[in-house]
Amino acid sequence: MAKGKDARVTIILECTSCVRNGVNKESTGISRYITQKNRHNTPSRLELRKFCPYCYKHTIHGEIKK
């Protein structure tokens, strides 16, 4: 039998430096990654350092609402 809600949910990670600077002349968009997290182990918002192809460097990508 299944237990209540699923613990694993799909989330979207978005580049914080692209969002903070706005879409300036250098960048053509905002980097987003799709991944999963376990709601029981990490109830808070997830932040990971990932490569942003628009900034051309590794930046912090934070979880956003769908």
UniProtKB/Swiss-Prot annotation:
Statement: the UniProt record of this protein carries the keyword Thylakoid: no
* MF term (GO), any: structural constituent of ribosome
What keywords is this UniProt entry annotated with?
Chloroplast, Plastid, Ribonucleoprotein, Ribosomal protein
Instruction: Tell me where the transmembrane regions lie.
Output: none
One short Pfam name that applies is Ribosomal_L33
Q: Which GO terms describe its cellular component?
A: chloroplast; ribonucleoprotein complex; ribosome
Q: Could you tell me the Gene Ontology terms of the biological process aspect for this record?
A: translation
- Read off the InterPro entries from this record: Ribosomal_bL33, Ribosomal_bL33_CS, Ribosomal_bL33_sf, Ribosomal_zn-bd
Which subcellular locations apply to this protein?
Plastid, Chloroplast
NCBIfam families in the record = PRK00504.1, PRK00595.1, rpmG_bact
As for family, the record states: Belongs to the bacterial ribosomal protein bL33 family.
What is the recorded name of this protein? Large ribosomal subunit protein bL33c
